[in-house]
Regions:
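Charge-rich, well-structured scaffold segments of protease-associated domains
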Residues: 1-79, 95, 105, 112, ...
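Short gly/ser/thr-rich secondary-structure transition/capping motifs
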Residues: 35, 88-89
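Double-stranded RNA-binding/processing signature
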Residues: 86, 119
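Phosphate/diphosphate-binding glycine-rich loops and adjacent basic-rich segments that engage nucleotide
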Residues: 91-101, 105-108, 117
Length: 272
């Protein structure tokens, strides 16, 4: 099932560097040598894109000393070229015949980039649709009520210049079309019907609880802080993030649902 995630990005971002499999392929790997690796480092690693992030009981003065010791002599090198922006999305529908026990399906659409003001709303919407909790819309519709899928999930990835929303599930071959219809039915409900005040409040509190728990993983917190500073030149406190989530209205969610869950703009990849 992991392969379908890579190949779905290839379908969505066809012809763009984002579509390239992060593991590469045997031909490219065989062609690697010292010169090509050094050239890659020179083209992609720059001092203006470096952040030192730490979490825990670390003396800040000692951290500065260590940073200066190992990075103080680094030559200043600024990024010269930006990545080509992806702007030629064409929805695709691909069926791949595979000898698998189940059918595997990916569905999705472009979403908001990391700088977009609707990003936080999209995070909440994704959590409602198929996030970590057992009460997500798709988990209830396909797994709990119908028993059609053991694993169904949605994801939202925000890049610097584009974003991707996707849904994945595996199901028995004979249930594939019914499962797809149920997913599209949930999308339609979210496009047409506002969440009630109580529903929205529960969804907001659930997401905030997940964020609070995630801060207990110190490595993830360290990486999140570093990424935030690199992208936004600041690090929001958990309380600030919570205020942004609490400010989301039913109309905000409805608007984002109509932008991202548009069935005519959905791409689909099926292994069957």
């Amino acid at each position: 099932s992991e392969l379908i995630f890579d190949e779905f990005e290839e379908l969505i971002y066809d012809g763009h560097p984002i579509a390239r499999n992060i593991l590469g392929n045997p031909v490219n790997l065989a062609a690697f040598n010292r010169e090509s690796i050094l050239r890659f480092i020179g083209n992609n690693y720059h001092t203006d894109q470096m952040v030192i992030s730490s979490v825990g009981k670390i003396d800040f003065g000692e951290l500065i000393k260590l940073t200066e010791k190992y990075f103080g002599q680094a030559e200043t090198k600024l990024r010269q070229n930006g990545r080509m922006r992806f702007d030629n999305y064409i929805p695709g529908n691909l069926l791949v015949e595979k000898d698998t026990f189940q059918s595997h399906c990916m569905m999705g659409n472009l979403a908001f980039d990391v700088m977009h003001p609707k990003r936080i709303t999209m995070v909440l919407l994704n959590n409602i649709i198929g996030g970590q909790a057992m009460n997500s819309r798709l988990n209830m519709a396909l797994r709990e009520r119908k028993g059609m899928a053991y694993n169904i999930e949605s994801g939202y990835t925000a890049y610097t210049d584009t974003g991707l929303f996707n849904v994945y599930f595996g199901t028995d071959h004979e249930n594939l079309e019914k499962a797809i219809s149920l997913v599209l039915k949930e999308f339609k409900l979210l496009r047409e019907k506002k969440l009630g005040v109580l529903q929205l409040s529960k969804a907001q509190k659930q997401l905030m609880g997940q964020i609070a728990i995630s801060t207990e993983n110190r490595e993830d917190l360290m990486l999140t802080i570093g990424k935030s500073y690199l992208l936004f030149n600041k690090v929001d406190t958990v309380q600030t993030i919570f205020k942004k989530i609490e400010a989301i209205s039913p109309i905000d969610l409805l608007e984002v649902a109509n932008m991202v869950l548009d069935e005519s703009q959905m791409s689909r990849l099926v292994y069957k």
